[in-house]
Amino acid sequence: MFDLARDGHSEELAAYVDAGVPVNLTNDKGDTLLMLAAYHGHPDTVAALLARGADPARENERGQTALTAAVFKQSREAVTALLDAGADPHQGNQSAIATATFFELPAMLELLQRGRGT
């Protein structure tokens, strides 16, 4: 399942989730399918998982969220989808806002601020 998320195989992954695989399945580091899709730059997979109830507020063992991963990878589409699903840019030990600030990603910071009215 995790490789499907990493590789952006949206339709195949969605079929497994529709057949009963937990949409919030985590690996040994606490990374969800949603986090892996966001980190590896697959906004279509992010959208497919969100449509099936993936929780954008889940944190891995480092306190990172899917939104933080999408910001780090500078995926505007994934960031927008996650914000639209209610992701909090201030959540986590390494929040999306902190990540955008630390890595000097002004376009991501603007998107986060505009998207959540912060």
Annotated model-derived regions:
Residues E12, D44-T45, E77-A78, A107-L111:
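Conserved ankyrin/ankyrin-like repeat signature
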